[in-house]
From Swiss-Prot:
Annotated protein name in UniProt: DNA polymerase I
Keyword tags: DNA damage, DNA repair, DNA replication, DNA-binding, DNA-directed DNA polymerase, Exonuclease, Hydrolase, Nuclease, Nucleotidyltransferase, Transferase
Enzyme class: transferase
Catalytic activity: DNA(n) + a 2'-deoxyribonucleoside 5'-triphosphate = DNA(n+1) + diphosphate
Region: Polymerase, residue numbers: 492-890
């Protein structure tokens, strides 16, 4: 069942080094702490104490990020050479402990964020700005006053500081705090502000005039508020004041996107993950505490459950049976041995998406099976393995988005999934309308039922009420399944679910478990190379432009390019790729900016995240989404392996890092050739198009000959190619003119000439549009459809729907063929380790095959994909390449 996005909670942002340094110096006031070997442990002791405190308070910080300082020179240090230079060097004893502390944080499962060239304060400012949650900054640094708002608070370890407290303490608003710092300076960071003007006068100036800029715009008013000496200092130190304000201003845009759900507080005590290290460094009392402390009950952290204790003595009873011992579970399993047993099931997760329990419904009776020690599960791993094996052997399992549940059972309990009987109502909903697949929206759409919204679950006060909610959801799941099976979904689509989509889910699970290996040392080198290159590019760009600004800020870039440099503007002052390409020749920095952006995206999307996501075998396990696109095309996330660039040299460097899992294997890439155009020939039955494919001719050259004649055919082939593909993507003359960079009239003339030469294609496309208008549906090769609502639609919307409908026919049918091909190959090599399907990218399949039999395996896979997938009126064709690295799978 679809799990809700968590909208409530607090994000804790930790000023890591400041916290650790303070702990170290507090411990060093007395005798410096060391272990029995004489190694200093004061900072590590502070870290352990901090984690203990945070774990105790974890309900108030369900999300946590440790912000780190950049290891390279920061922007502020580049602006002011003396920045922070007045600070004493850190003691050697402390420096020895910092790498250990950072390693411990990562081992404990905490998310640590460092951004090259920026301080931890900037990381915190950016994350606090992006955060959808209430945010608490753990620091004593007064610079964070500028961030205070209804959503953001500052906590110094004892006291919470809010926006109103800033007004009360300093007499100014948080938004004025950088102006305040610009005047008074900051001795700890070594910027001066205005010499001789203190907090009292700074407050008066800002209360009267509002900002540093307004003060200097109204010097006659400022003069009346200051002594003559202070006024002279204000005039003299103007440059210092604005530099100080700039240095005090935290960068809120050094991080553009962030997955906040990835930084959930670990469900178990993080210190358990560093027990060996604690022993090595002499934390004996901490180890003793860990051994003596009971495992906490965390049922109350589940998104479906509230934050009250899970156990109570309320007399109210639930209709759910809690399976707390072997006897009732064994009795339940015996009931399943009769034929046609159906079990409606869902996982119960905590806020970190960790599985706590399995809830299921059988013959109108609900059951709750705790699986984690945190819920006092009494069952051994072996007992549960046997129980789930029997359950899947005897019963059909029905759920909404079943893949996570089945993947969990396979990963944790090694339950075989090959011959199980399953039904996924999310797939059924997808086949009825691919744009409505969420459990809540499907219930509302088809059963006119609304579940209690997840965000209101905090109103429940007892364990019984929580279980009752699970019972309500499971019964709703049963009604939804019955709705689809008893007329809510056409019989041909029910057959499609049974014969194609459900087996395909099992193929996807196999691909996810297999994973795609990366060359980790290569990616570590590439990460550093990209870091260095980004730094060089940034310096080159800033030198060419002559202004120091944040290159990652579209707003600042827009101001610099269009206002300072006076480059030709677009209406929205946009700096997206399309806009920058139009002014590419107007300034030498533009090409470098585009290069910087591409590299920065690769760095932040792939190099660093891939190293974080790899497992112990250096494999990346993406998650495939079967119901995520309206056309039926497969998508993936965490990470998105289908989006790894292929057309740029830098993008190919990312693909180069993906390799075969061992020296006995190699990679095989098999790519369908012009699959959408073959479908166009099949559907339209155009004799010229069919003949070209049947005789193996160059289809784009043949089209070019038909349009422009033999003499110009080769020269105009690219235009013919754009028209060929444009038709199946629903492209009109406007889009074609933009694609080819030609006039609208010329684009129209090409399309008219094309349809005049291929009238049967025009007739077919017109028939399809009429059919879409009539039925509000666009059908694929296998009978799937996409739904369009033309009610009240104007001509513009209708035109868009018709283009999308035509596109859905071809993209959806191509998806059908890819699924059939993947199923055929998977069935042919079932339980055969010589062939492993790793990935689908558009019309290409990536396999891992035994190298010793590579030519024979390639030939057999191509034969299946070419000849056994579907009897089109024209042949399917594939090209194939064998290599050791992904980037080499090309001609």
């Amino acid at each position: 069942m679809e799990q809700p996005v968590i909208k409530e909670g607090t994000l804790a942002l930790i000023d890591t080094f400041a916290y650790l340094f303070r702990s170290y110096y507090m411990s060093a006031k007395n005798k410096p702490l060391t272990n029995d070997k004489g190694f200093p442990t004061g900072l590590l002791t502070g870290l352990v104490g901090m984690v203990k405190k945070f774990y105790k308070d974890r309900k108030n910080m369900p999300f946590i990020v440790f912000a780190l300082e950049s290891q390279t020179k920061t922007k502020r240090a580049e602006k002011l050479g003396e920045y922070k230079q007045n600070r004493k060097d850190a003691p050697k004893e402390m420096l020895l402990q910092i790498p250990i502390a950072l390693e411990w944080l990562q081992k404990m499962g905490f998310v640590c964020v460092e951004v090259n060239g920026f301080e931890a304060d900037d990381v915190i400012a950016s994350l606090a700005t992006l955060s959808p949650y209430k945010t608490r900054i753990y620091s004593k640094d007064k610079d964070f006053n500028q961030l205070l708002s209804d959503k953001i608070a500052l906590f110094d370890g004892k006291t919470e500081f809010l926006a109103k407290d800033c007004v009360e303490k300093y007499g100014i608003l948080p938004s004025q705090f950088t102006d305040y710092q610009g005047i008074v300076g900051d001795s700890s960071d070594n910027y001066k502000g205005v010499k001789g003007i203190g907090s009292k006068n700074a407050k008066e100036l800002l209360q009267r005039l509002g900002s540093l800029e307004k003060i200097y715009e109204n010097l006659d008013l400022a003069k009346n508020l200051l002594s003559p000496k202070m006024y002279r200092a204000l005039i003299h130190d103007k440059a210092s004041a604005f530099l100080s304000k700039e240095l005090a201003t935290l960068e809120r845009g050094c991080i553009k996107e962030f997955d906040f759900l990835s930084c959930a507080f670990p469900s178990e005590n993080p210190l358990l993950k560093i027990k060996d290290e604690l022993k090595e460094y002499g934390f004996i009392s901490t180890l003793r505490d860990l051994e003596n402390s009971p495992t906490p009950l965390i049922l109350d952290n589940a998104p479906l459950l509230d934050n009250t204790p899970a156990l109570d003595n309320t007399p109210k009873k639930s209709c759910m049976i809690v399976l707390e011992s072997a006897a009732p579970l064994s009795a339940f399993l015996e009931k399943l041995e009769k034929t046609n047993a159906r079990v409606f099931a869902r996982l119960v997760l905590d806020k970190e998406k960790k599985v706590l329990a399995l809830a299921f419904l059988y013959e109108d009776q609900g059951y709750f099976l705790p699986l984690e020690e945190a819920l006092f599960s009494p069952f051994s791993l072996e007992f549960l393995q046997n129980a789930f094996f029997k359950m899947l052997q005897h019963a059909q399992i029905i759920g909404h988005d079943l893949k996570p549940l089945l993947s969990f059972l396979k990963a944790k309990y090694q339950v075989p999934l090959e011959n199980i009987r399953i039904q996924d109502t999310q797939i059924l909903a997808f086949l009825k309308n691919p744009e409505k697949v969420g459990f809540d929206e499907v219930l509302k759409e088809y059963l006119k039922e609304e579940l209690i919204p997840h965000e209101k679950i905090k109103d429940f006060k007892t364990k019984a009420e929580k279980l009752e909610l699970l019972s309500v959801e499971l019964n709703a799941l049963k009604r939804l399944c019955e709705y689809f099976e008893k007329g809510g979904l056409e019989e041909n689509l029910l057959s499609l679910a049974r014969e194609i989509e459900t087996p395909f889910m099992k193929v996807l699970m196999g691909m996810e478990f297999q994973g795609f290996k990366i060359d980790a040392p290569y990616f570590k080198r590439l990460e550093q190379e990209f870091k260095n290159e980004l730094h060089v590019l940034e310096r080159q760009i800033l030198e060419l432009i002559g202004v120091d600004f944040n290159l990652n800020s579209p707003k600042q870039l827009s101001e610099v390019l269009y206002d300072k440099l006076g480059l030709p503007k677009n209406k929205s002052h946009s700096t997206d790729e399309k806009s920058l390409l139009k002014i590419l020749d107007k300034h030498p920095s533009i090409a470098l900016i585009l290069e910087y952006r591409e590299l920065n995206k690769l760095f932040n999307t792939y190099t660093t995240p891939l190293l974080r996501l790899k497992d112990k075998d250096d494999k990346i396990h993406t998650t495939f989404i079967q119901t995520g696109t309206a056309t039926g095309r497969l998508s993936s996330h965490s990470p998105n392996l289908q989006n790894i660039p292929v057309r740029s040299p830098k993008g190919l460097l990312i693909r180069k890092g993906f390799i075969a899992s061992s020296k006995e294997y190699c990679l095989l890439g098999v790519d369908y050739s012009q699959i959408e155009l073959r479908l166009l020939a099949h559907f339209s039955q155009d004799k010229d198009l069919m003949e070209a494919f049947l005789k193996g001719r160059d289809i784009h050259l043949e089209t070019s000959k038909a349009l422009f004649g033999e003499y110009l055919a080769k020269e105009k082939r690219s235009i013919a190619k754009s028209i060929n593909f444009g038709l199946v993507y629903g492209m009109g003359s406007k889009k074609l003119s933009e694609t080819l960079n030609i006039s609208l009239n010329e684009a129209k003339s090409y399309i008219e000439a094309y349809f005049k030469r291929f009238p049967s294609i025009k007739d077919y496309l017109n028939r399809m549009k009429e059919e879409i208008l009539k039925t509000s549906k666009a059908f694929t090769l296998l009978g799937r459809y996409r739904v369009f609502d033309f009610t009240g639609a104007n001509d513009y919307v209708k035109g868009n729907y018709l283009r999308e409908g035509v596109n859905a026919i071809f993209q959806g049918s191509a998806s059908d063929l890819l699924k059939l091909g993947m199923l055929k190959v998977s069935e042919r090599f079932k339980n055969n380790p010589s062939v492993r399907l790793l990935l689908q990218v558009h019309d290409e399949l990536i396999f891992e095959i035994e190298e010793k039999n590579a030519p024979e395996l390639q030939q057999e896979i191509q034969r299946i994909l070419n000849d056994e997938v579907y009897p089109l009126r024209v042949p399917l064709e594939t090209s194939a390449f064998i290599a050791k690295r992904w980037n080499e799978l090309k001609g």
